Amino acid sequence: IYNQNYYFFMVFSLLLKNGISISKAFDLAIIGLENKFLIFQYKKLFSFIDSGLELSQAFKKIDIFDSLVFSMLSVAMKSGRLEVLSEEIAKYYQQKSENLMDKFLVFLEPMMTLFVALLVLFLALGIFLPMWELSSGINF
């Protein structure tokens, strides 16, 4: 979800920087999303914005975003710098995505080490067990 939010806000920011209206930029940014749940939520958000609700209030109504996003959007609407702060929100979600991936990899590393150790043990036993059985059959 973090990666999809990153994508949405980055595209949204780039479109706004190039002079596209908020409603058109919102609509175009939704097109690139792959997560069906997020597409549905963003379309619902778009309908709230079309009905005249302020952007930060519409995001609060959806309730899938962090409180930091609400406050950044509120500041963006008051300052008129939505394109800049939406890029900052994109960077925030990119950082959250990278942190989640790092946590997953920290968990995965010992599991992979254990898997390789078991594989080496299996191969070593496959080689040495027949040799030990051969030597036990020979009498001196």
Locations of the language-model features?
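Glycine- and small-hydrophobic-enriched helix-loop-helix hairpins
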Residues: 1-105
